[in-house]
């Protein structure tokens, strides 16, 4: 029965992908210019953050790059400068509230108002729940969601005054579905998706329609935090593909950026009738979506 349901899901995904491609071909979304705008990217020392910085550098944005890894973020900055961008580098621990507030104040003094912020810094410690260390659970939430609160609280006032800006939350498909051995990570990403949605609603209520929000939700990204990743329907992505999708989503003011895009319909179909997940010991787990495939977590610590 599971194979039949997966086949139907695959058919739905294929149909959706073709229809989406046709719509994009005949009705392309208008792209905005970010040339000269100040863009703050956290977790810019490698991975998605680094490659997103490259994409903004190609757009001739002015970059403010944060990372806890000085060497990594300096390497990112060097490449961005070669691409023609003006770059400012800050070594920041995004799990430290005081450090975040102090760094934002420094950015305001030395660079000016931030017009686009990409909250990308992330932490993950794969383990079953009982093996997860308390300090690792705490660190996961400090970086993956609490850091978002402190950064936006510090940057939002100037955006509200101007009624202009763009707030980007880097979450994950794990903010919509679940996977074993990543309970703290999945929980923090559910919180990140909720943060994006609640902030979007609040800005709309305030009438601040000039402030855009986007949330990036990729599936598994090849950043080395899992061993032998394999999925039946969802691919393992390269960071370059995710960064390109993110910049395209930002330039078109897309609210929810799924990578690949058919993940959206996949999640909807899996939550529909007949697609409820079964607990290994029996029973149903609706409406939470299990992520298909088999991922064996490594012991590596990941920062985006």
Curated annotation (Swiss-Prot):
Transmembrane segments: none annotated. It is found in: Lipid droplet; Endoplasmic reticulum. Its EC number is 1.1.1.-, 1.1.1.62, 1.1.1.105. The modification Phosphoserine is found at residue 33. Substrate binds at residue 172. Keywords: Acetylation, Endoplasmic reticulum, Lipid droplet, Lipid metabolism, NAD, Oxidoreductase, Phosphoprotein, Signal. NAD(+) binds at residues 40-67, 189. Plays a pivotal role in hepatic lipid metabolism. In vitro, it catalyzes the oxidation of a variety of lipid substrates, including 17beta-estradiol, retinol, retinal, and leukotriene B4. This is 17-beta-hydroxysteroid dehydrogenase 13. The gene is Hsd17b13.
